[in-house]
UniProtKB/Swiss-Prot annotation:
Signal peptide: 1-22
Subcellular compartments: Secreted
GO CC terms of this entry: extracellular region
Free-text function comment from the UniProt entry: Toxin that potently modulates mammalian voltage-gated sodium (Nav) channels, reducing the voltage threshold for activation and inhibiting channel inactivation. Is selective for tetrodotoxin (TTX)- sensitive channels. Shows activity on hNav1.6/SCN8A (EC(50)=285 nM), mNav1.7/SCN9A (EC(50)=352 nM) and hNav1.7 (EC(50)=403 nM). In vivo, causes spontaneous, gradual and long-lasting nocifensive behaviors by intraplantar injection in mice, as well as noticeable swelling of the injected paw. Does not have effect on insects (blowflies).
Primary location group: secreted
Tissues with expression: Expressed by the venom gland.
Highest taxon in the source lineage: Eukaryota
Keyword Ubl conjugation: no
Protein's name according to its UniProt entry: Myrmicitoxin(1)-Pm1a
Note: Negative results: does not show activity at hNav1.8/SCN10A (EC(50)>1 uM) and hNav1.9/SCN11A (EC(50)>1 uM). Does not exhibit hemolytic and cytotoxic activities on HEK293 cells.
Length: 84
C-alpha cells in the first residue's frame, strides 16, 4: 500500500521539478529570484502534501480491491458453479 502512494508522490515531484527547470530564465535576475521563490514554495507545498498523504489512511482501498476482484470472482463462479 505504501509503494503506489510513494510512486505517485515521486511522479509529481519529478514533473514539478522538470517544469520549473524548463521555465527558469537565465538573463533576468528578477525572474531568477521569482523562479527561486516559486521553487521554494513548490517544495514546501510538496513536502506538506507528502506529510499529509502519509498521515491519512486510505479508506477507499478495500472498496477498490473488491471492485478489482469482481472479474476473478465471476470467472470462478462460472467455472465451478455454472459449468460444473
Amino acid at each position: 500500500m505504501e509503494i503506489p502512494k510513494l510512486l505517485y508522490i515521486a511522479v509529481i515531484a519529478i514533473g514539478l521539478s522538470g517544469s520549473l527547470t524548463c521555465a527558469t530564465p537565465l538573463a533576468d535576475p528578477e525572474a531568477e529570484a521569482e523562479a527561486k521563490a516559486t521553487a521554494e514554495a513548490t517544495a514546501k507545498a510538496t513536502a506538506e502534501a507528502i506529510a499529509e498523504a502519509l498521515a491519512e489512511p486510505e479508506p477507499g482501498l478495500p472498496l477498490l480491491a473488491l471492485l478489482f476482484s469482481l472479474p476473478v470472482l465471476q470467472h470462478w463462479i462460472e467455472k465451478n458453479w455454472i459449468n460444473g
